[in-house]
């Protein structure tokens, strides 16, 4: 079930879930402060999505999961597998830190941002999603928020899934988790997804017609072994990889993207009484090809980004009084190999971070703080900090306030790429304020927050800079987020409203591809054994650029306005037996035609049917 943080729950006898139909006081999260704590004790707005909910919604991608959550706006160049941008509270997609099992996703490539459309949904067992700055906990990138993808399965057993759908969609996956003796657990899972896709049609004045199907195929494999060496020591070894192929329309050509990615993690954990510690090491390697399918993967016109990333973490947690303190060290090394067509030679950068976080409760007041220092090989030392507090001024009603700093380090392409790179770039920097109130009024659990985010030293390359990357930009973001949940008999309701005014602080123009207003509504209803789910989303109007229409007088591309749209999804599931469940979904029920990225169509109405067998 989804869990939306409600501060009053941390201070009240009864814990309520602002985003769940049922209450689970034992739900734990680790993302907010890098120590395990009840979901109802975190000050920052936090949402947890479980595998149970992903199955109930019958989501087909991680972007499909994220688009339903408060503060999230998705811009995507077409359908399943097409390039996507995740905007949290109006910030850039590169301002979102994506973790997999608490370890940074490999972002050593040229763009420096995470494309969630490429992460197989079959890997995802839980999502912990934090809104607001978290650089004082994790370092670079966490300006808009943090998304932590958990792959660990909660219980043993075997699951077989098969699904079909519109546009030639097929999905097959199998997973098993078994105990090997009293101390060892092993998990193995595999997945295959394919769709013929549709013509996403990149329109532009410089673009010819490209009548084709832009399909997607993904194959993934996952395995892990966990072992308990005793009551206090445990360890794990985990590996996963995926092979994705995406056909897409560029503004001047038909292209194919081929992405190979593999990751290996291992770690040791120790816990004794009020103290625990863990040491984790990780290695990931990805090869990202872009090529003309008529000429082949290794043709002269193809491009390759061959990147590696090494991570090491040592974290310590100590229970102190009515709270917890966490401290540790992170180390990361990113490498682009010399056979990459995006750089002239092998390039690397490394970062070492030291952090301290803590939370304490004093009667009706909760205080939280974190501080971190990062030593980066290119720009040196950078400090960040964050503090927050809540006060239950009346039983069941709380005031919350926080302030924090954050930063985003220049990515590898901006520092070392063949076009416009600049080794003298400095980090993008952010200052964020947030305040809010939440309460329980009758059956309704609600929260209203207002926030402001000022971002300086934004990196850009324009004609005025000679098309060389410079720290020349500024952004000013103001917003309001309101959430509520309540039950009416057997029906659960969850509603969120987002108002985001995200602007270029120099020109006062709206930032591209971000809707000013969004409304999201989720209804879950179980009638006898039939489980219904209705999802509504209103996407307000947004602005984008027509990259086929350059205007020299203003050194920019023409701005275009994309209209708003209302979308409905309908899903239902029925347990035929205690082992077999059949699910069906209609996405975009009323077949609305809309765009979240200019020139790129969306899928229209789609139908899906899935069978799941567990034993």
From Swiss-Prot:
One of its GO terms (biological process) is monoatomic ion transport. It is found in: Cell outer membrane. A motif (TonB C-terminal box) lies at residues 598-615. Ca(2+) 2 binds at residues 212, 214, 248-249, 255. Its main location: membrane. The keyword Ion transport applies. This is Vitamin B12 transporter BtuB. It comes from Pectobacterium atrosepticum (strain SCRI 1043 / ATCC BAA-672). The gene is btuB.
């Amino acid at each position: 079930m989804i869990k939306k943080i409600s501060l009053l729950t941390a201070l009240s006898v009864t814990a309520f879930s602002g985003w769940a139909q049922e209450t689970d006081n034992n739900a734990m999260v680790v993302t907010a402060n890098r120590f395990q704590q009840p979901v109802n004790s975190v000050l920052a707005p936090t949402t947890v999505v479980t595998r149970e909910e992903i199955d109930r919604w019958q989501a087909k991608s991680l972007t499909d999961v994220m688009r339903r959550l408060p503060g999230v706006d998705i811009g995507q160049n077409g359908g399943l597998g097409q390039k996507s941008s995740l905007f949290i509270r109006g910030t850039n997609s590169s301002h979102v830190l994506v973790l997999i099992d608490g370890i940074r996703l490999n972002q050593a490539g040229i763009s420096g941002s995470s494309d969630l459309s490429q992460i197989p949904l079959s890997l995802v067992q839980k999502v912990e999603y934090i809104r607001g700055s978290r650089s004082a906990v994790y370092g670079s990138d966490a300006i808009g928020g943090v998304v932590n993808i958990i792959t660990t399965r909660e219980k043993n057993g075997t699951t077989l899934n098969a699904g079909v759908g519109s546009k030639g969609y097929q999905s097959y996956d199998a997973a098993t988790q078994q105990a090997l003796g009293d101390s060892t657990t092993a998990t193995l899972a595999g997945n295959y997804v394919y769709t013929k896709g549709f013509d996403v049609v990149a329109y532009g004045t410089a673009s010819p017609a490209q009548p084709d199907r832009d399909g997607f195929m993904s194959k993934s494999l996952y395995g892990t072994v966990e072992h308990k060496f005793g009551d206090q020591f445990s360890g794990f070894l985990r590996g996963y990889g995926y092979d994705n192929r995406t056909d897409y329309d560029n503004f001047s050509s038909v292209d194919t993207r081929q992405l190979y990615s593999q990751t290996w993690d291992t770690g040791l954990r120790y816990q004794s009484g009020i103290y625990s510690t863990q040491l984790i090491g990780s290695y990931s390697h990805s090869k990202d090809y872009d090529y003309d399918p008529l000429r082949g993967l290794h043709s002269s016109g193809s491009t390759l980004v061959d990147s590696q990333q090494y991570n090491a973490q040592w974290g310590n947690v100590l229970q102190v009084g009515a709270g917890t303190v966490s401290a540790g060290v992170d180390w990361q090394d990113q490498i682009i190999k010399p056979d990459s067509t995006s750089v002239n030679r092998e390039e690397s950068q490394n970062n070492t971070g030291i952090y301290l976080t803590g939370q304490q409760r004093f009667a009706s007041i909760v205080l939280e703080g974190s501080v971190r220092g990062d030593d980066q090989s290119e720009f040196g030392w950078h400090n960040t900090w964050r503090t927050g507090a809540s006060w239950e001024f009346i039983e069941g009603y709380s005031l919350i306030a926080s302030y924090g700093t954050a930063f985003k380090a220049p990515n590898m392409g901006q520092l070392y790429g063949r076009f416009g790179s600049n080794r003298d770039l400095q980090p993008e920097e952010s200052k964020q304020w947030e305040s809010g109130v939440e309460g329980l009024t009758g059956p309704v659990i609600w929260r209203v927050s207002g926030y402001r985010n000022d971002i300086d030293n934004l990196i850009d390359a324009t004609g005025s800079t000679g098309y060389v990357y410079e720290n020349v930009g500024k952004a000013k973001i103001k917003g309001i987020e309101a959430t509520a949940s309540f039950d009416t008999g057997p029906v659960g309701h969850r509603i969120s409203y987002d108002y985001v005014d995200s602007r270029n602080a120099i020109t006062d123009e709206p930032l591209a591809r971000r809707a000013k207003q969004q409304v999201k509504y989720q209804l879950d209803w179980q009638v006898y054994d039939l489980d219904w789910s209705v999802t509504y989303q209103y996407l307000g109007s947004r602005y984008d650029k027509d990259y086929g229409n350059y205007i020299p007088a203003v050194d920019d591309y023409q701005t275009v306005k994309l209209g708003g749209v209302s979308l409905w999804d309908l899903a239902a599931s029925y347990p035929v037996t205690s082992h077999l469940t059949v699910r069906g979904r209609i996405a975009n029920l009323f077949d609305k035609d809309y765009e979240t990225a200019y020139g790129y169509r969306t899928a229209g109405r789609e139908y899906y049917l899935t069978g799941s067998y567990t034993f």
